[in-house]
UniProtKB/Swiss-Prot annotation:
Its EC number is 4.2.1.25. It comes from the Bacteria. Changing C441A: Increase in activity and still binds a 4Fe-4S cluster. The lineage of its organism: Bacteria, Pseudomonadati, Pseudomonadota, Alphaproteobacteria, Rhodospirillales. This is L-arabonate dehydratase. The gene is araC. Its cofactor is [4Fe-4S] cluster. GO terms for biological process: L-arabinose catabolic process to 2-oxoglutarate. Activity is enhanced by Mg(2+), being optimal with a concentration of 1-10 mM Mg(2+).
């Protein structure tokens, strides 16, 4: 703890005996708060994304109670407040559309209220980046408490994974391998408790990223949602955030360039979601840390994927916790000289390496040795070329090795509705060597960059035993999904990107090793085609231009995938200077 305590923001509400202090205290006292609670102790916000519409976060009211116990025990004053809960499971057209809106909610709630530090209760995919983005814009002391994954999914005595099983079973249904009854019987078995997806999807990936970044306590990522140790971690986080408030340990001291480099390496080791590329860029943008797509190649390249979890591997998240969780992975990386910045500071005041140097590994089938990885080179690939001049991403650990270098004929879907209307057509001119191309599903074009990039294959090819094809889009893909899928093509079609120029029958070349994605037409032909494209005609854009509202604001200001899909006016740190009095 520093020798001089920082001045707490909350004293500018409750620390005076004038009219303003009287009013602020009086209003709070209608909740039964006694005088001694206003003695200058740190006021700790608990930013809660609980909602019955976000089943991943359905247990957060109980989680918040355990955080409060820790805060009170440490001498703090807990105040819980709600923010927009942008859950992936129900929210249309995409939770990505409202990630930035949720971050604005968080930022303004922190800055405008008597909050000295904040605990971020995050669970479903976009809640973690949204909360971190908002808190980073204020640069206050903050700690992430993730909700944790669901219990293992079960079907007919076997483990099944959230999301992953949906894609697998639906493909089997379309191929005629199972009937509808068998397909629907998996619903309850896949989701057996509160919590996030029990695979290494985006929610678990971002929980791991929070831990690797140092903004969460060790083991935050993997403890199952309904395990009592999840509530112990919440309690201990409540204790620690009070200490952080008194120490002045703000996010900018933790979310450094070194921390982001550690997170990129960790993402490769766990086989994490491609969505982390967008979210880490957005968080870095809010805290003022430069982070580029090339960093993913430089740091992630040649990193073995050593965690054998669905969708890349065999096991669900519950087994990951029992094996040792992320600390065991980080220790293994560190001992192999693969942890870029072991001295990076974390929320408990220790270095990342100090937190993990003694971490045990209880199951080397789940967390493998470096010399026996699941994938020898598992880092997310960044692709560039005339089809993606500002980049695209591909996840090798979820792809088919034989398709990572491929040349095929394009089968083009102008938008998601076009895909849905034609994919089941037995007359569709497509074969296993074709490259499926989906346009107008990016940040502006959808809008909100939905998770539709892992297009299901045509039933006629599934019946032939085809399991994977090269797919290219400006969309995203669920972290629970798999396949040789090129995502986040930038610029997107609805921003006038080259993807808009692709036509049926064009030849496309993918070379993952070389990092290239090439449309085999001349530059002159590409320019000629693009001159005929009207980006405002994309269905997602055209459908919103006359309506106004948040979606219109988003379309007008959203950045491209390589820039993190933040709104242009939100990038940067605005601090937590106390605003003027409200009366």
């Amino acid at each position: 703890m520093s020798a001089t305590k920082p001045r707490l923001r909350s004293t500018q509400w409750f620390g005076t005996n004038d009219k303003n202090g009287f009013m602020y205290r009086s209003w709070m006292k209608n909740q039964g708060i006694p005088d001694h609670e206003f003695d200058g102790r740190p006021i700790i916000g608990i930013c809660n994304t609980w909602s019955e519409l976000t089943p991943c976060n359905a247990h957060f009211r109980k989680l918040a109670e355990h955080v409060k116990r820790g805060i009170s025990e440490a001498g703090g004053f807990p105040v819980e407040f709600p923010v927009f809960s942008n859950g992936e499971s129900n929210l249309r057209p995409s939770a990505m559309l409202t990630r930035n809106l949720a971050s604005m909610d968080v930022e303004e709630a922190i800055r405008g209220n008597p909050i000295d530090a904040v605990v971020l209760l995050a669970g479903c995919d976009k809640t973690t980046p949204a909360l971190l983005m908002g808190a980073a814009s204020c640069d206050v002391p903050a700690i992430v408490v993730s909700g944790g994954p669901m219990l293992n999914g079960k079907l007919e005595g076997k483990n099944i994974g959230s999301g992953t099983a949906v894609w697998q079973l639906h493909e089997a249904l379309k191929a005629g391998e199972i009937d509808v009854h068998h397909f629907l019987s998996a619903e309850a078995g896949m989701s057996r408790s509160a919590g996030t997806c029990n695979t290494m999807g985006t929610a678990s990936t971002m929980a791991c990223m929070a831990e690797a970044l140092g903004v969460a306590l060790p083991h935050n990522a993997a403890i199952p949602a309904v395990d009592s140790r999840r509530y112990v971690l919440a309690h201990m986080s409540g204790i620690r955030i009070v200490e952080m408030a008194l120490e002045g340990l703000v996010l900018s001291k933790i979310l450094t360039r070194a921390a982001f480099e550690n997170a990129i390496r960790a993402n490769a080791a766990i086989g994490g979601s491609t969505n982390a590329v967008i979210h880490l860029k957005a968080i870095a943008g809010r805290i003022g840390v430069p982070l580029e797509l090339e960093d993913w190649m430089r740091i992630g390249r040649d990193t073995p994927t050593i965690v054998d979890l669905m969708p890349s591997g065999r096991f669900p998240m519950e087994e990951f916790y029992y094996a040792g969780g992320l600390p065991a992975v980080l220790r293994r990386l560190g001992e192999g000289g693969l942890l870029p910045n072991p001295d990076a500071l974390t929320v408990n005041g220790k270095s990342l390496w100090d937190n993990v140097r003694e971490a045990p590994n209880y199951d080397e089938e789940v967390i493998r040795p470096l010399d026996r990885p699941l994938i020898a080179d598992g880092g997310i690939r960044i692709l560039r070329g005339n089809l993606a001049p500002r980049g695209a991403v591909l996840k090798p650990s979820a792809a088919s090795p034989e398709l990572l270098k491929h040349r095929g004929r394009a089968v083009v879907f102008e938008n998601l509705d076009h895909y849905k209307a034609t994919i089941n057509d037995e007359a569709l001119d497509i074969d296993a060597s074709s490259v499926m191309v989906l346009k107008n599903c990016g940040p502006r074009g959808y809008p909100g960059m939905a998770e539709v990039g892992n297009m299901g294959l045509p039933p006629k090819l599934l019946r032939q035993g085809v399991k994977d094809m090269v797919r290219i889009s400006d969309a995203r893909m669920s972290g629970t999904a798999y396949g040789t899928v090129v995502l986040h093509v930038a610029p997107e079609a609805a921003a006038g990107g080259p993807l808009a120029a692709v036509r049926n029958g064009d030849w496309i070349e993918l070379d993952c090793e070389a990092g290239t994605l090439h449309l085999d037409i001349t530059d002159d032909e590409l320019h000629r085609r693009l001159s005929d494209v009207d980006p405002t005609a994309a269905p997602g854009v055209a459908g919103q231009l006359g309506k106004g509202g948040y979606a219109r604001l988003y379309i007008d200001h959203v950045l491209q995938a390589d820039e993190g899909c933040d709104l242009d006016f939100l990038v940067g740190t605005r601090g937590a200077e106390v605003p003027s009095h409200s009366h």
